[in-house]
């Protein structure tokens, strides 16, 4: 991975697709515009906007309670994710990264109690304000679309994964895209292998006082690009210096903010200079015109 990050800009040209009218949208009135959510999840954008931020939607008191519970449980158990040679993070919850269906569900079953223990700090109403399960179920059902957890045989996806990104060098989270890793699901027919889109949904539980901005580039890498950089099944990492001339946007997120983002676009998190950044989230994918699922 070190060799990849030191590639000279003249050695590699990143190829892929871009959006016209690339940008993002915000809601600040506490009302979620489901048309925007639907278009990002089903089509990857809303008139070119690949990110939708809903400001101050979740209770800051609930976010703070979860953040404190997260810190306590990570201190006690060390979290659920060991150093995998890719990213350094404190984590509670499962990840499908580098796992097929069988491996992912095994991991989900291993860590589910940790997620349940963490969520004990919330009520059913709190959980809905954080993850919008009932809202998304209702809105999609009205359009004849099923929304729910991804399934592999008799197992279901993790409810959500909580992460605090640590120091990963140039950035807290290096530029990457999240479609490539779905390739592992093809090994055993895990249904997310059929996803046509990958949307990242996150709620910011704790915001950094310095740095930690979400950054998105106007580029969806193609398979040739992945192969050139050796990230065909991980989508991680893309060298930041190769993106210097690529259109991008940076957004500061605060505790209580929710966001939906087209995770097929290259994105990352800038270095944190003060404080720390904690999010909880999941991926959402459109399998077909009648089914949308989430996983972690």
UniProtKB/Swiss-Prot annotation:
What EC number(s) are associated with this protein in UniProt?
1.14.11.74
Residues binding Fe cation, per UniProt: 176, 178, 267
Cofactors: L-ascorbate; Fe(2+)
Q: Does the keyword Coiled coil apply?
A: no
The record's listing under InterPro entries reads: Ile_3(1)-dioxygenase-like (IPR053685), WelO5-like (IPR055091)
How does the cofactor bind to this protein, according to its record?
Binds 1 ascorbate molecule per subunit. Binds 1 Fe(2+) ion per subunit.
Q: Which GO terms fall under molecular function for this chain's record?
A: dioxygenase activity; L-ascorbic acid binding; metal ion binding
Key words, A-Z = Dioxygenase, Iron, Metal-binding, Oxidoreductase, Vitamin C
Q: What is the reaction catalyzed?
A: L-isoleucine + 2-oxoglutarate + O2 = 3(1)-hydroxy-L-isoleucine + succinate + CO2
Q: Which family does it belong to?
A: Belongs to the iron/ascorbate-dependent oxidoreductase family.
**What does the protein in this record do?**
Catalyzes the hydroxylation of L-isoleucine at the C-4' position to form L-4'-hydroxyisoleucine (4'-HIL). Exhibits low activity with L-valine and L-methionine.
Stored NCBIfam families: isoleu_diox_hilA
The protein's name: L-isoleucine 3(1)-dioxygenase
Origin species, per record, is Pantoea ananatis (strain AJ13355)
Gene encoding this chain? hilA
């Amino acid at each position: 991975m070190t060799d990849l990050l030191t590639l000279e800009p003249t050695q590699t040209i990143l190829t892929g697709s871009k959006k016209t009218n690339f940008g993002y949208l915000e809601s600040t009135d506490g009302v979620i515009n489901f048309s925007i959510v639907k278009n990002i999840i089903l089509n990857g954008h809303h008139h070119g906007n690949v990110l939708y931020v809903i400001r101050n939607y979740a209770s800051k008191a609930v976010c703070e309670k979860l953040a404190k519970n997260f810190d306590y449980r990570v201190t006690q158990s060390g979290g659920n994710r060991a150093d995998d040679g890719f990213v350094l993070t404190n984590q509670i919850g499962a990840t499908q990264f580098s796992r097929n269906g069988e491996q992912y569900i095994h991991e989900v079953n291993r860590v589910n109690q940790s997620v349940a223990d963490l969520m004990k700090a919330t009520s059913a109403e709190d959980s809905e304000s954080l993850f919008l399960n009932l809202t998304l179920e209702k809105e999609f059902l009205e359009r004849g679309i099923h929304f729910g957890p991804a399934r592999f045989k008799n197992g279901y996806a993790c409810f959500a994964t909580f992460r605090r990104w640590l120091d990963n060098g140039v950035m807290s989270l290096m530029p990457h895209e999240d479609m490539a890793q779905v390739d592992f699901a093809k090994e055993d027919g895990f249904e997310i292998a059929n996803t046509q889109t990958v949307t990242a949904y996150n709620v910011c539980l704790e915001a950094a006082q310095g740095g930690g901005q979400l950054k998105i580039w106007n580029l969806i890498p193609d398979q040739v690009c992945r192969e050139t950089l050796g990230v065909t099944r991980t989508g991680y990492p893309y060298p930041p210096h190769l993106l210097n001339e690529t259109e991008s946007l940076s957004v500061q997120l605060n505790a209580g903010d929710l966001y939906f983002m087209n995770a097929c676009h290259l994105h990352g998190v800038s270095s944190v200079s003060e404080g720390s950044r904690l999010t909880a989230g999941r991926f959402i994918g459109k399998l077909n015109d009648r089914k949308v699922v989430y996983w972690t």
